[in-house]
């Protein structure tokens, strides 16, 4: 049987797309392999958000060129595919920089991958079009891969933040219908998935057709998904502060399947930098939104993204970011040094922050965020949380899962608990995960 190796870089959307590409190849008779050395087709599903991520891809392609040559010497053919956002952004340039690549395919065209592979027998192929037809209408049934699963409900972004390539690589905002999303969710749950994370570049801008033909909101969509038998948990990512509607806040307060965890990027605490980033909100507007959300769901865990060293960022601007973080408090966060991306407005600016200053600011911000994360985890010790068991643990007799607040937990319990909710008393907090013990009688009941 032919074998396919699919590697994904970057965001949850890429992870979803990588899984769907594996499904497309499986429908063509390819079995999945974890060994790139034995793969007949190698797919790199790429990320273009930061320069470092893109360069990782080219480094990997250099290694694959050697592997392809070695396999050819033994009479084995290898097709190399570059998919995702680097493919969309750089197109034919990839063929020039990486001679071993056979197919370049964008994130809206990968449903055509089998045809592109066949064409590549004659000539190298690039397909980065935004097709008129919806790719989701052409994808095969999903193959389930665990207790949790991603489900794309929205793609693209219309915000055009000054630093971001997503509007150029993923296109304008489009949403799937409520019926299509619910049907995919139903199939996932029938296959064993118990927690679904709804994903989109700007997921709370969701506006898919509802049952009556009118646009539905993300809150309405989650209400519809809550009726899927067997579904235990719902999450969603990533959101923009400007699209956070009242019905979504109400879903956190009133829908028991919606978990008390929210990833809501702010990027900076400085109004001057937020304006330069074209974020369309202020630091105080973000604070007021968080206050409303916490009023509706006091136990919610907050996560965010931060960029340090955006062009023109002064010491005073960075101090505003530190002040916002200190005032709000985050359970988790992702912070990065600004990386210019070709074609974005920010890349044209000439007031770059020195690399040494970026590094210093990132270290200071990360130290504060780490302190907040450790404090949040430590506060869980002594409490009881319902853990959705996802897999076996690192040690014999151990399983692992997550709290409603997305904290990883390890504890002793039989493998039969996988896919169930188990009440666990948290006994210890590590640097990146929690440890606990099952309440007496709970594991046996599960």
From Swiss-Prot:
Where, in this chain's numbering, is [4Fe-4S] cluster 2 bound? Answer: 157, 161, 164
Record's subcellular location? Cytoplasm
The UniProt record gives the binding positions of [4Fe-4S] cluster 1 as: 11, 47, 85
Q: Which reaction does it catalyse?
A: N(6)-dimethylallyladenosine(37) in tRNA + (sulfur carrier)-SH + AH2 + 2 S-adenosyl-L-methionine = 2-methylsulfanyl-N(6)-dimethylallyladenosine(37) in tRNA + (sulfur carrier)-H + 5'-deoxyadenosine + L-methionine + A + S-adenosyl-L-homocysteine + 2 H(+)
Q: What molecular function terms (GO) are annotated for this protein? A: 4 iron, 4 sulfur cluster binding; metal ion binding; N6-isopentenyladenosine methylthiotransferase activity
Q: Extract the SUPFAM superfamilies matched here.
A: Radical SAM enzymes
Q: Does the keyword Iron-sulfur apply?
A: yes
- Describe the location of the MTTase N-terminal domain by residue ranges: 2-122
**What InterPro entries does the record tag this protein with?**
Elp3/MiaA/NifB-like_rSAM (IPR006638), Methylthiotransferase (IPR005839), Methylthiotransferase_CS (IPR020612), Methylthiotransferase_N (IPR013848), Methylthiotransferase_N_sf (IPR038135), MiaB_methiolase (IPR006463), rSAM (IPR007197), rSAM_horseshoe (IPR023404)
Q: What class of enzyme is it?
A: transferase
Domain Radical SAM core span(s) in chain numbering:
143-375
What is the cofactor note?
Binds 2 [4Fe-4S] clusters. One cluster is coordinated with 3 cysteines and an exchangeable S-adenosyl-L-methionine.
What Enzyme Commission number(s) apply to this enzyme? 2.8.4.3
Q: Pfam families given for it?
A: Radical_SAM, TRAM, UPF0004
Needed cofactors: [4Fe-4S] cluster
This protein's UniProt keywords: 4Fe-4S, Cytoplasm, Iron, Iron-sulfur, Metal-binding, S-adenosyl-L-methionine, Transferase, tRNA processing
Task: Please state every residue range assigned to the domain named TRAM.
Answer: 378-440
UniProt signal peptide: none
Q: Which GO terms describe its cellular component?
A: cytosol
Quick check: keyword RNA-binding in the entry? Answer: no
Q: What does this protein do?
A: Catalyzes the methylthiolation of N6-(dimethylallyl)adenosine (i(6)A), leading to the formation of 2-methylthio-N6-(dimethylallyl)adenosine (ms(2)i(6)A) at position 37 in tRNAs that read codons beginning with uridine.
NCBIfam families given in the database record: miaB-methiolase, MiaB/RimO family radical SAM methylthiotransferase
Q: What is this protein called?
A: tRNA-2-methylthio-N(6)-dimethylallyladenosine synthase
Q: Which organism is it from?
A: Methylorubrum populi (strain ATCC BAA-705 / NCIMB 13946 / BJ001)
Q: What is the lineage of its organism?
A: Bacteria, Pseudomonadati, Pseudomonadota, Alphaproteobacteria, Hyphomicrobiales
Q: Which gene name belongs to this protein?
A: miaB
